[in-house]
Design a protein with these regions (language model features):
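C-terminal output helix
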Residues: 105-114
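Short, glycine/charged-rich "phosphate-handling" switch motifs in NTP-dependent
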Residues: 98
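Receiver (REC) domain active-site loop signature in two-component systems and cognate sites
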Residues: 54
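Conserved acidic carboxylate
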Residues: 7
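Active-site residues of response regulator receiver
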Residues: 51, 81
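Short hydrophobic/Thr-rich beta-strand motif most characteristic of the beta2 strand and flanking loop
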Residues: 24-31, 39
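Charged docking surfaces used in two-component/phosphorelay signaling
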Residues: 14-22
């Protein structure tokens, strides 16, 4: 399964990428929402993990644009974020996100959490 990971913090991006690769995923990484929109058509990911707060375009705007485009709307979006308050999670789900994973995340179980959200 191919994941597109959008995370602007290099250390978090590295840990998430290594954790997901160890869990058997193919991982493509980018640093912001604009880069997600630029590469989603060519990379054709099975799911997208989005950081909430990123430069240039945040995760919410990115998710909104992905879900508004018929070509990318079916791709599951999972937020990977420190902002997991109930109202913010509800907002993400209302935009069409499949779920949210809180930061800091457990590197040993990140891949399993992604699979659980995608299976729901």
């Amino acid at each position: 399964m191919k994941l597109l990971l959008a995370e602007d913090e290099p250390d978090v991006q590295l840990i998430a990428r290594l954790s997901l690769k160890k869990a058997g995923f193919t991982v493509v990484t980018v640093g912001n929402g604009l880069e997600v929109l630029d590469c989603v058509a060519s990379e054709r990911p099975d799911a997208i993990l989005l950081d909430w707060m990123m430069p240039d375009m945040d995760g919410f705007e990115t998710c909104k644009r992905l879900k508004a485009d018929p070509a990318t709307a079916p791709i599951p979006v999972i937020f990977l974020t420190a902002r997991v308050q109930e109202a913010e999670v509800a907002r993400a789900l209302a935009l069409g996100a499949a779920g949210c994973i809180g930061k800091p995340f457990d590197a040993l179980t990140l891949g399993q959490r992604v699979l659980e959200i995608l299976a729901a």
